[in-house]
Design a protein with these regions (language model features):
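Mobile active-site "lid"/loop adjacent to the S-adenosyl-L-methionine
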Residues: 118-146
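Conserved SAM-binding motif I beta-strand of class I
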Residues: 68-73
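Conserved Class I SAM-dependent methyltransferase catalytic core
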Residues: 16, 20, 141-198
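Conserved class I S-adenosyl-L-methionine
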Residues: 37-44
């Protein structure tokens, strides 16, 4: 059995088409979760890693009554594996996993925070593994446009949407966000090394609020080693940090 060990929880990493990855961990660490948040949604939860990181972050604060972190996934195996990971974690009381596509998800609540690490290989050749294709190709499954449309109507007042995408999709993401009344408050561009262009972008949107976004950059590697900036971010999660 494939298990990824974090400092405070383990992730079964076998049945989900998309495995534990740096993108998801960074999204969970950087998403603007607040102690007052009660309803949190992870769209395309996969193994549940993002939701688990968020739960660990909340565990350092008094968790309010009624707090729920929900992870949804279109893939039955992924949702089942996330459910196992949630139930075996220290925060099983606030985590729940659902097998459902976003298009059919009709919750009876709004959300204070929505996060997603959606598929992003728009122009890639179709993956021969149908489940991985759904997990990785926007044409086959979940798209950030669908997420933006959902967030427009489902974010509570003051709610936030946080998405990680390849950096070359940032302009389109911001443009479509504006079309749905969502405006960026924070933009974090991620570089593998300083000399290269950013490879990923984490954008946080707020519903209805217009402001000049806070922009920052994270460099992961320098001279063959992890940067202090990166290690400082992941030190509570990865065993190597």
């Amino acid at each position: 059995m494939s298990i990824f060990h974090f400092k405070k929880f383990d992730v079964k990493n076998e049945r989900s088409a998309m495995k534990v990855n740096t993108d998801g961990v960074l999204l969970g660490i950087c998403a603007p979760i607040q102690p007052s948040d009660r309803q949190i949604l992870d769209i395309g939860t996969g193994t549940g890693t993002v939701a688990l990181v968020l739960a660990q972050r909340l565990s350092g604060t008094p968790i309010g009554e009624g707090t729920v972190i929900t992870g949804i996934d279109i893939d039955k195996d992924a949702a089942g594996e996330a459910d196992e990971n949630f139930r075996e974690s220290p925060w099983s009381g606030i985590l729940t996993a659902l097998h459902t596509p976003l298009s059919e998800y009709n919750p009876d609540c709004g959300f204070d925070l929505i996060v997603s690490n959606p598929p992003y290989y728009d122009d890639s050749l179709t993956n021969p593994d149908a489940r991985k294709a759904t997990a990785r190709h926007t044409g086959d499954g979940l798209s950030y446009r669908e997420i933006l449309a959902f967030a427009e109507t489902r974010l509570n007042t003051g709610g936030r949407l946080c998405i990680i995408l390849p950096a070359d999709q940032e302009k389109d993401l911001l443009r479509y966000g504006r079309m749905h009344g969502l405006h960026p408050s924070n933009i974090l561009r991620i570089k593998t090394v300083q000399r290269k262009a950013p490879s990923r972008t984490i954008v946080t949107f707020k519903s209805g609020e217009r402001a000049v976004p806070v922009e920052d950059c994270l460099v992961i590697m320098e001279k063959g080693s992890y940067t202090r900036q990166y290690l400082s971010l992941v030190k509570d999660y990865y065993l190597f940090a």
